[in-house]
Amino acid sequence: MWEKVDQLTPSRYSPYRFFSAQEWAAFRADTPLTLTYEEVKRLRSLGDPIDLDEVRRIYLSLSRLLYAHVEASQLLFRQRQQFLNMEESYKTPFIIGVAGSVAVGKSTMARILKELLARWPSSPKVDLVTTDGFLYPNAVLREQNMMERKGFPESYDIGAVLRFLSAIKAGMSRVRAPLYSHLSYDVLPGEYQIVDKPDILIFEGINVLQVRDLPEDGKMVPFVSDFFDFSIYIDADPRLIHKWYIDRFMRLRETAFRDPQSFFHRYSQLSQEAARSIAEGLWQNINLKNLNENILPTRPRADLILRKGSDHLIEEVALRKI
């Protein structure tokens, strides 16, 4: 894994510092554990085995690191306002981007991080928004023959993403983020999450570190990551992600897919062998292709890379040097 992150040799010239999970855990110092077992169980996604031990090993050190970054960011903002002889008229939220493949554990990580940060002594207001709501509606994707490209860069309304993040960074109140239903596998028309001047925003999705081609006319093209103060990439060997994806699909076949309102309800009626074959096809033709072409190449752009092992728990950490 690290060979692709570390493009330069010898290793001392790498833009990252590398740590084992045990080494990383030591950076927790005296950061308190503010979550309970039941809370972690409630926050984790289907098939994700994360427990309190994993929170202690990885997340408390991460919480301490982010606290330092947020404090430094706020200090710099105040100093810049003083330098410009400006009164502090609005609050600039600290935005954290969370990226990685489908089935790698982004959602669990983002939810647990949200709870930990909100329980800092300063009690910051923390919001979590996913990019799912910024997908084009299925009707639009069907019209453009893009349903099989859902999740690829062109299936997202990037303009809407940039407008949303720009409004958040500008300190605007009651900014709307469109909502998405995993039951109907579609954007919910007319339904929104209201984001009202958070201290910290966690923005999670497979595409948040992606870049676009620069226009030939030389005009400025903003990237989603331009709005981030810190970014995290959840990583694992693609063979492991493949297994987790298939396992999750088969679990959903026995649970959520059984709901008649589910977009994937038809898969619950198939035999186990037929359903597994469908899942394999979805992985090979859509998700693996998207991972290799669009998601994995963004990994070196992250400030922090969390590498998972076969048990779905984080084994290695890479932190970008400042």
Curated annotation (Swiss-Prot):
InterPro entries: P-loop_NTPase (IPR027417), PanK (IPR004566), PRK/URK (IPR006083). Pathway: Cofactor biosynthesis; coenzyme A biosynthesis; CoA from (R)-pantothenate: step 1/5. One of its GO terms (molecular function) is ATP binding. Coiled coil: none annotated. Transmembrane segments: none annotated. It is found in: Cytoplasm. Keywords: ATP-binding, Coenzyme A biosynthesis, Cytoplasm, Kinase, Nucleotide-binding, Transferase. Its EC number is 2.7.1.33. Pfam families: PRK. GO terms for biological process: coenzyme A biosynthetic process. GO terms for cellular component: cytoplasm. It catalyses: (R)-pantothenate + ATP = (R)-4'-phosphopantothenate + ADP + H(+). ATP binds at G100, S101, V102, A103, V104, G105, K106, S107. Signal peptide: none annotated. Belongs to the prokaryotic pantothenate kinase family. This is Pantothenate kinase. The lineage of its organism: Bacteria, Pseudomonadati, Pseudomonadota, Alphaproteobacteria, Hyphomicrobiales.
